[in-house]
Amino acid sequence: DMATLFVKAFNTYPWNEEWTFEQAFTRIDEIMSARVSRGYVVYDGDTVVAMACGRIMTYIDFKELWIDEFSVNPLYQGKGVGSKLIEFIRNELKKEKSKISYLALNTERDYPCVSFYENNGFSASETNLVMFANVDYKGNN
């Protein structure tokens, strides 16, 4: 299922993270729990080999699909599965009642996936910056 694929994809190179099935399931469930959530899955027989999930969000006068998670089974990477999934997503979004203008996502700089996304029509924003802050931050005192 999606959580199993998530663990396979993100616990290997280049991410080398340490997800458990339960953590992955919870993350996907959280993403998919809203009215604006969308999920897409590619199967090879009974096996999930690629998936994307995210949310359709309004930004001023247009909508965009923010892809929160996108993963392809490492054994299927480089075989066009991910590109076909993105093409499928674009076609599905064209069927939505409201026009969806953009696909958007965050990823790590200098990772192999950057060229994959660029080859599928994504480009890096020159103006946007993702920032994080620890909840326990107490200021510069």
State what each model feature region is.
Residues 7-29, 37:
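Conserved GNAT-fold acetyl-CoA-binding loop/helix
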Residues 1-13, 140-141:
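A short, well-structured alpha-helix characteristic of acyl/acetyltransferase catalytic modules
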Residues 77, 103-114, 132-136:
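Conserved beta-strand-loop-alpha-helix junction that forms the acyl-donor binding cleft
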Residues 41, 47-56, 66, 71:
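Conserved beta-strand in the GNAT
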Residues 57-67, 77, 96-101, 125-126:
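A conserved beta-turn-beta hairpin within the catalytic core of GNAT-like acetyltransferases
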Residues 109, 118-127:
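Conserved acetyl-CoA-binding loop of GNAT-fold acetyltransferases
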Residues 86, 94-108:
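Conserved GNAT acetyl-CoA-binding A-motif
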Residues 72, 78-91, 119:
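Conserved acetyl-CoA-binding loop-helix of GNAT-fold acetyltransferases
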